[in-house]
Regions:
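Outer-membrane beta-barrel "beta-signal"
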Residues: 182, 464-488
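Detector for outer-membrane/organellar transmembrane beta-barrel domains
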Residues: 296, 310-411
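Residues on the lipid-exposed face of transmembrane beta-strands in outer-membrane beta-barrel proteins
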Residues: 143-144, 212, 228-238, 268-280, ...
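Residues that define the transmembrane beta-barrel architecture of outer-membrane proteins
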Residues: 137, 202-204, 222-232, 264-270, ...
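Transmembrane beta-barrel strands of outer-membrane/channel proteins
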Residues: 173, 206-212, 249-257, 289-297, ...
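Repeated loop/turn-to-beta-strand initiation elements of outer-membrane beta-barrel proteins
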Residues: 104, 148, 240-244, 282-286, ...
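Extracellular loop and loop/strand-boundary signature of outer-membrane beta-barrel proteins
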Residues: 218, 305-312, 355-362, 412-419, ...
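Hydrophobic alpha-helical membrane-anchor/signal-helix detector
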Residues: 26-53, 79-120, 132-149
Length: 488
């Protein structure tokens, strides 16, 4: 199973090997390899000489042992495996992307960087789930941060504008900022315009939302916690009027911070077009079908009676599949409709487990499928009603924890996906946006999360969680009123 999963990642890289490159940047493959290796060396050095982490004390014996042991399912905490590893993969990806390499070669670079870390850079056995999450999640986060940061490039800018642009580029994609510094592009003023900053073909619509969020971990209407939230939504490219040209020429991003005593990441959802074809029957009516990549990281925490609960814990770190989108938006018609359906394979997903707790892991890993549907109707220019549904069916196969031998084994070598089970996760979202001006709108959203975990050796567990948000949205750039194409 593990070999098949890694082979699937290699196939994804090879299929996209000739995908679009950055034509304005000279190809520097060896520099890209060196930077990816340097990222690993830097992280290892921090752990070895600053943090003195036990796993960083490597030598030739530990490397040989890793090759002999092979890949296992590790027991790191949810945020590490399902978000930080994909972010790390995005750094590998951009080491190649920002050195002029294609999407496919950059995907291969993310896989290579992950394999280098797992096999050579730590004493713990190599992790198959880390390779999957780092590569697939790194492709999504890497290409998105590359395109967003590159769209901010303006080689004409001077003074304060140039400073904030270069700072934003580096914040969004540290590797892109590093390479611009290395090449001297960060301060060089010229008349050349970067290929990725073409506003005509790479428009970005960004909205920032803030407000109040109510969360009930037990599904009870009048019991729960109230916190603030800060949400960023990005729609990059034009799905409605621009045909497919390259992977991720269209993508959407939604990132949600929960504001309590401190801000905590609670929701990251990504949708990127890998390939598509479309047919427009009449002006304003278009049917689009193709392949799409998804990334989901959803954690909703609450504290009640001095006890921490985890009502929602969902991850789709390696997800891709087919999608069908129908848009009915004639320019003269005040009522515009969008509906979509995505059927995906889940190479790696994760959900909360009620019976598994080893080291830092309290969740199940697994494979399965997911179905997503996004639906919205826009009434005039000032009101949009939406109804979205997300189903994930995750199967946890590998579990040897009941064996006496595995109970006495070093837990780092346990090699289990979790408690053997199959889990259905349902996420239903309904909401309404009302525009207040060209750049301001108010929104009310309701969420229902349901988890049905059927365990082979334990009683079934069902959880229900309700969430409601009331907020104000501010269009940061390119206000499009209420875009009928936006799906997240």
């Amino acid at each position: 199973m593990k070999n098949y999963l890694i082979a699937a990642l290699w196939a994804l890289c090879i299929l996209n090997i000739e995908a679009q490159t950055d034509s304005t940047t000279r190809h520097r493959p060896w520099l890209a390899v060196g930077e990816a290796a340097g990222i690993n060396a830097g992280v290892w050095a921090m752990n070895r000489y600053v943090a003195h982490a036990p796993f960083a004390y490597i030598d030739f014996k530990t490397i040989r042992k890793n090759f002999r042991t092979g890949f296992v399912w590790d027991n790191d905490k949810f945020s590490t495996n399902m978000f930080l590893h994909p972010y790390h993969g995005g750094l590998y990806f951009n080491a190649f992307r920002t050195n002029g390499m294609s999407f496919g070669w950059s995907a291969a670079g993310a896989l290579g960087g992950s394999l280098m870390w797992e096999l050579f850079m730590e004493t713990e056995p190599p992790s198959i789930n880390d390779v999957l999450a780092t590569t697939a999640g790194g492709i999504a986060l890497g290409e998105i941060t590359f395109r967003i940061s590159s769209s901010l490039v303006n080689n004409h800018a001077r003074g304060l504008e140039r400073v904030w642009r270069e700072a934003a580029i580096t914040l969004i994609s540290p590797v892109n900022g590093f390479n611009r510094l290395l090449r001297g592009d960060m301060w060089r003023v010229n008349t050349l315009r970067d290929a990725w900053s073409n506003e005509e073909s790479h428009q970005t619509c960004a909205t920032l939302s803030t407000g109040t969020a109510w969360l009930s971990p037990n599904g009870k209407l009048f019991k729960g916690t109230i916190n603030g939230f800060l949400k960023l939504k990005l729609e990059h490219g034009d799905l409605f009027s621009k045909p497919y040209s390259a992977p991720y020429d269209y993508f959407e991003v939604q990132a949600d911070l929960t504001i309590r005593q401190q801000a905590t990441m609670g929701d990251v959802s990504l949708l990127g077009r890998l390939w598509s074809h479309d047919r427009e029957s009449t002006p304003g009516k278009k049917l689009i079908w193709g392949l799409f990549q998804h990334f989901d990281y959803i954690v909703k925490d609450t504290t009640s009676n001095n006890r921490r609960q985890v009502p929602v814990q969902i991850s789709g770190a390696a997800v891709a599949g087919a999608g069908l989108i129908w848009i009915n938006a004639p320019q003269s018609d005040p009522v515009k409709l969008k509906t979509s359906l995505f059927v995906n394979a889940v190479l790696l997903g994760g959900t909360h487990s009620d019976y598994f707790s080893v080291l830092e892991r309290d969740y199940n890993l697994g494979n399965g499928y997911s179905i997503k549907s996004f639906n919205a109707i826009t009434l005039g220019k000032y009101c949009r009603i939406k109804l979205n549904y997300h189903l994930m069916h995750l199967f946890t196969w590998r579990n040897k924890i009941d064996s006496l031998y595995y109970r006495t084994l070093d837990p780092h070598y346990l090699d289990v996906q979790g408690t053997q089970s199959n889990t259905l996760v349902h996420v239903i979202q309904g909401g309404c946006d009302v525009a207040l001006s060209d750049r301001l709108s108010a929104s009310l959203d309701l969420y229902y999360y349901r988890r049905e975990s059927r365990y082979d050796d334990f009683p079934m567990v069902t959880t229900n969680t309700l969430r409601m948000t009331l907020g104000i949205n501010w269009w940061l750039s390119n206000p499009r009123k209420l875009s009928p194409a936006s799906m997240l």
